Design a protein with these regions (language model features):
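Glycine- and acidic
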Residues: 20-32, 49-53, 106
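Sec-exported extracytoplasmic/periplasmic mature domains
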Residues: 47, 51, 74, 78, ...
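Secondary-structure capping and boundary motifs in well-ordered enzyme cores
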Residues: 8, 31-38
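Non-catalytic terminal regions with compositionally biased, polar/charged low complexity
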Residues: 50-89
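Internal hydrophobic alpha-helix adjacent to the cofactor/substrate pocket in enzyme cavities
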Residues: 36-55
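Short, solvent-exposed alpha-helical surface patches in non-cytosolic proteins
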Residues: 90-103, 109-136
């Protein structure tokens, strides 16, 4: 989301090929499905900023506002993370997406599967219960 919000210019959102990226990651961002997702994210962020009277930069920088924005996306069925085994419509979709976004799963692993039917161990259980997801 931070790639859409310029550091020095207020109330401007980048979308599509003009987002803040490097030459290394640009190979991913130039693909049409990713461009469409970037456009959807920019439009959703603009609408959220207008609805809340806040600047897009505030949403990126304030954790509570970011979580509020993310909850709205989840309510609309927009995935925040690519989990191949917990698709939109799965009753566990919101919970698993929220856990990933709050840093309770997959951080730094690049995992595309959540494994919702697998048992978890005590270490993983304690890490999950420690996750802070802003509710208000």
């Amino acid at each position: 989301l931070g790639a859409l919000v310029p550091r020095r210019i207020e109330n401007l959102l980048a979308a599509n090929k003009n987002i803040g990226t490097t030459h290394i990651t640009n190979g991913c961002y130039r693909l049409h499905p990713v461009e469409w997702n970037i456009g959807e994210a920019a439009g959703s962020l603009a609408a959220f900023a207008l609805d809340t009277g806040r600047k897009p930069k505030d949403v990126v920088e304030e954790r509570g506002l970011l979580r509020q924005f993310q909850r709205g996306l989840l309510a609309d069925g927009v995935p925040l993370s690519w989990l191949l085994d917990v698709p939109v419509g799965d009753p566990r979709f919101d919970a698993t997406q929220s856990l990933v976004m709050a840093g309770g799963y997959g951080e730094g692993t690049g995992a595309l599967e959540f494994g919702p039917d697998l048992a978890i161990g005590p270490d993983e259980r304690s890490r999950w219960t420690a996750v802070q997801w802003v509710v208000t």
